[in-house]
Design a protein with these regions (language model features):
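Accessible peptide chain termini
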Residues: 1, 353-355
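Bacterial Sec-dependent N-terminal signal peptides
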Residues: 1-35
């Protein structure tokens, strides 16, 4: 069918406009790449990055353990029982949007070590690299088993001969939405009860098992958006069995933190620009209000007893049954949290949640 809005007189104009748009886009990405390269050169020349500009608590100091070219665009780290630092890279994240180059061999999982004990990494081992590793977001290391979160998969990788190289991998879960998206599956955490805890943002949507079957929750219901809303928090056995949904209706809850009593804590990022970033204590079966639990409507829709301030309205805090926020921190996008219960840092940091 001929397009009535496209006549012969308009075609040259449209082609010229598309050409200008293409040239302008290319010029933008070229300028962006030049700027990034210049900043990277300054970063590498100084060898410390921007750590000298960070404000540090009196009596503490911060230093650079590793930087480029040893690692590139890390998204998550883990410290194993030997004190080695495991680094998950997402160098190939969204190249069609950001215009950055990609690594044709795929993203990497690195092991970094400080063999001479000078506080800087001097040994790098590539544990795994493959085209199927595509902008992963989470890593957990349990002895010689590595759990990698990368929508649509959760993988278990095994170092059978303990040489620092992955020997095999298998699917733990699959079918998770959010591939090449930061609202997908996030890192696993080992809890004091011997179970695994993990979460996903609101692009994750569902869990399937290794065979592609729906994973059922503690009540026998399929874990999907028909039975739950938006982002979710989970607990399961080490083999992925007996999955429990502990809370739901988050936007992009990033890496749940588990304390020594089994308490769960996490941050949740708001729709950008609404100063609604929040910290939550996660209680089992909790509805955390990102959308209307019954209708699925967003926070901006008019409703009974609507909150006056946007940052409160954002989480349906006046809706019956919605769990209150522990704290709202304003703007930003937290991407990590830990509950510190050790004694190496000054006492002021004991039993605090660090974001």
């Amino acid at each position: 069918m001929k397009n009535p809005f496209l006549n012969s007189k308009m075609k040259p104009f449209i082609l010229a406009s598309l050409s200008i748009l293409s040239i302008g886009t290319l010029a933008f990405y070229n300028q962006k790449s030049q700027l990034i390269n210049a900043l990277r050169a300054d970063f590498l020349n100084e060898g410390t990055g921007d750590v000298n500009d960070l404000e540090v608590y009196p009596g503490l100091e911060i230093s650079t353990f590793a930087t480029e070219p040893m690692l590139k665009n890390p998204t998550n780290i883990e410290v194993d029982a030997q004190g080695r630092i495991w680094v998950l890279e997402a160098y190939n994240y969204r190249p069609a949007i950001n215009g950055n180059p990609t690594n044709a061999e795929g993203d990497r999982i690195l092991i970094l070590e400080d063999t001479d004990k000078d506080g800087k990494a001097d040994k790098q081992t590539v544990f795994y690299q493959s085209k199927d590793l595509n902008a992963p977001l989470g890593i957990a290391v349990l002895d010689n088993v590595v759990i990698v979160s990368q929508s649509p998969y959760i993988w278990k990788m095994y170092d059978d001969n303990r040489d620092g190289k992955a020997d095999r991998k298998e699917i733990l879960f699959q079918g998770i939405g959010g591939e090449q998206h930061d609202h997908g599956a996030h890192a696993f955490v080992f809890g004091p009860d011997g179970k695994l805890y993990f979460n996903m943002g609101n692009e994750g949507k569902q869990l399937l098992d290794a065979k592609g079957n729906p994973v059922l929750d503690q009540d026998g219901n399929a874990i999907n958006q028909k039975n739950y809303r938006q982002g979710m928090v989970f607990r399961c056995n080490l083999d992925g069995s007996h999955v429990e949904v502990l809370g739901h209706n988050f936007r992009n809850n990033y890496e749940v933190a588990v304390d020594s009593y089994g308490g769960l804590w996490q941050s949740d990022n708001d729709d950008d620009g609404n100063k609604g970033v929040r910290i939550n204590a996660v209680f089992e079966h909790g509805n955390y209000g990102y959308v209307d639990e019954k209708t699925g409507e967003g926070w901006y829709i008019n409703r009974t007893n609507i909150e006056k301030e946007v940052h409160l309205r954002h989480w349906h805090l006046n809706d019956p049954g919605v769990m209150p926020n522990l704290l709202q921190t304003g703007s930003g996008s937290p991407t990590g949290m830990v509950v510190y219960e050790g004694n190496l840092l000054p006492e002021v940091f004991l039993s605090l949640i660090h974001i």
